[in-house]
UniProtKB/Swiss-Prot annotation:
Family stated for the protein in its record: Belongs to the bacterial ribosomal protein bL21 family.
GO molecular function: rRNA binding; structural constituent of ribosome
Alphabetized NCBIfam families for the sequence: L21
Entry GO CC: cytoplasm; ribonucleoprotein complex; ribosome
Keywords of the record: Ribonucleoprotein, Ribosomal protein, RNA-binding, rRNA-binding
Assembly notes: Part of the 50S ribosomal subunit. Contacts protein L20.
Protein name as it appears in the record: Large ribosomal subunit protein bL21
Swiss-Prot/TrEMBL GO biological process terms: translation
Lineage: superkingdom: Bacteria
Role this protein plays: This protein binds to 23S rRNA in the presence of protein L20.
InterPro entries: bL21-like (IPR028909), bL21-like_sf (IPR036164), Ribosomal_bL21 (IPR001787)
Species: Staphylococcus haemolyticus (strain JCSC1435)
A Pfam family: Ribosomal_L21p
Length: 102
């Protein structure tokens, strides 16, 4: 059984036991988190939401809160001695999908 959930403005296909990285969630490590925005549930019987499937939830356990690889942003204006170097690390949450309830 698999499901498509929406989190952080993205749609992610998940299965039970799968580990996924999502945009940072305000949850402590080791806690459980429930996704209510389930757009699609597939398996033996298919359920398509309009826009979400009624009563469907996906439960996950938080493994880790972290930050991604550093991205360097460099902007400049030619011949003006004007430049700026900036770095960014996107925060993420690593989850393990425990249960899909449809």
């Amino acid at each position: 059984m698999f499901a498509i959930i929406e989190t952080g403005g993205k749609q992610i296909k998940v299965e039970e036991g799968q580990e996924i990285f999502v945009e940072k969630l305000d949850v402590n490590e080791g806690d459980s988190f429930t996704f209510d925005k389930v757009l699609f549930v597939g398996g033996d019987s298919v359920k398509v939401g309009a826009p979400t499937v009624e009563g469907a939830t996906v439960t996950a356990t938080v493994n880790k809160q972290g930050r991604g690889k550093k991205i360097t942003v460099f902007t400049y204006k030619r011949r003006k001695d004007s430049k700026r170097k900036k770095g960014h690390r996107q925060p993420y949450t690593k989850l393990t999908i425990d249960k899909i309830k449809a």
